[in-house]
Amino acid sequence: MSVATSDMSGAGPEQAKAVLIAGPTASGKSALALRLAEARGGVVINTDSMQVYRDLRVLTARPTPDEEARAPHRLYGTVDAAQNFSAGAWLDAAAGALAEARRAGAMPIFIGGSGLYFKALTRGLSAVPPIAPEVREAVRERLARDGVAALHAELARCDSEAAARLNVADRSRVARALEVIIATGKPQAAWHAEALPPLLPPSEVLAAVFLAPQREALYARIDARFATMLAEGALDEVAALRARQLDPLLPAMKAHGVPALIRHLDGALSLDEAAAIGCADTRHYAKRQFTWFRHQLPEFCWVAPEEAGNYLGDVIPGRERSERARNP
């Protein structure tokens, strides 16, 4: 993996800096990013792990062709569903999009809900290579069978530093550390020492916001949006994926709604049952997004969606700080 150096030539001090818009699914991020891009001559750069897939425009709520025509959009629908697109691959692509925006003198606007992408963007990315699925599966099976204490004891024998650092009850991190040492032969600390630097250090971020709607309103919006997706062709998208007989472990095949709708197409669920599962999965994911950003990226400013336009209009200097950058 090689991350290109972003070129800041041709960009003024404001345009060279980026705006980051994160938030749970269905919180209004795309609409806000589009208004800001129109007001400031910005480029909208996808920071969502599912919206990279070209096969799922409807089911992942990618911007419509009309919306994409109103302002430049990058990294949307560029990857085939058969590809396992990693955070490292996204970071490479994001570096190119950032350099392109800066050469054009346009404000880079990173928008999405994938916390790992934002963390890689602003904190850097671990150099740990992808762990083979069979190694991960074997460790998870042992975790379920033998318990976390047994895995922690094994970790202490092969990576004592990680074992000393991790709580014996932390199932996910203990399993991850053991996966790394088994798959690569190197402890986590050695890989962390080789981590890539952030693409956007704090000095190059103009504003970073997390849209935080009221939970009940968000959940209602998620349910309504899933119904709209079905009306606009989401089932046809999933049918096309199903016909390709792709590996069900691929990221695109695990997008919210895809597994349940495939079960419907297989005759195992009614459409209403599949939709209910898709909505529930999406609501659970939104809940995890709140928790993840709160603990992993506390530097993001949490704002209500209806106040986000005003907030960005206040924190972004310049004459373009106008009603167009605000909520209508």
Curated annotation (Swiss-Prot):
Presence of the UniProt keyword Transferase in the record: yes
Site (Interaction with substrate tRNA) at S114, R136
Could you tell me which cysteines form disulfide bridges? none
* Domain of life assignment: Bacteria
The GO terms describing molecular function are:
ATP binding; tRNA dimethylallyltransferase activity
Q: Which cofactor does it need?
A: Mg(2+)
Q: Of which family is this protein a member?
A: Belongs to the IPP transferase family.
Q: What is the protein named?
A: tRNA dimethylallyltransferase
Which species? Answer: Rhodopseudomonas palustris (strain BisA53)
